[in-house]
Amino acid sequence: MDFRIGQGYDVHQLVPGRPLIIGGVTIPYERGLLGHSDADVLLHAITDALFGAAALGDIGRHFSDTDPRFKGADSRALLRECASRVAQAGFAIRNVDSTIIAQAPKLAPHIDAMRANIAADLDLPLDRVNVKAKTNEKLGYLGRGEGIEAQAAALVVREAAA
């Protein structure tokens, strides 16, 4: 069996006038994340981790932020397409672990819904998807509430040809 690990990272600036969508969940907050798509920082990090694990490049290679087709795109749809491309490359997704770093808002009440969305989009059992939320202890741009960051790791496997 051919096991592969990928890691992903994303960060977006918090700005007024946009919804805050993380893990496919709309979170009540006075600011949202700035981006070409819906700017779902968590799903972008997971997408990058999956593409990386399968050696398929990164999210920008597949869903360019200069391509008008992806303007305002639903990152859950992008994640599902990523999973399809990973499968077409011969890999099965085994698990995803992720961390969101945000000073505010509190994300703990939304984590179960995020996990459920990710598990559904990747066709994984819930116990193979983990989401953690941390603050940056008021340090740096994250601590000042200027943005939100996410990191992710993914494990994929390709069975050896018989």
UniProtKB/Swiss-Prot annotation:
The protein's UniProt keywords, in alphabetical order, are: Isoprene biosynthesis, Lyase, Metal-binding
Hydrolase is among the record's keywords:
no
PROSITE patterns this protein is in?
Answer: ISPF
Q: Where is this site: Transition state stabilizer?
A: 36, 135
Instruction: Write out the pathway annotation from the protein's UniProt entry.
Output: Isoprenoid biosynthesis; isopentenyl diphosphate biosynthesis via DXP pathway; isopentenyl diphosphate from 1-deoxy-D-xylulose 5-phosphate: step 4/6
- Assembly notes: Homotrimer.
Q: What is this protein called?
A: 2-C-methyl-D-erythritol 2,4-cyclodiphosphate synthase
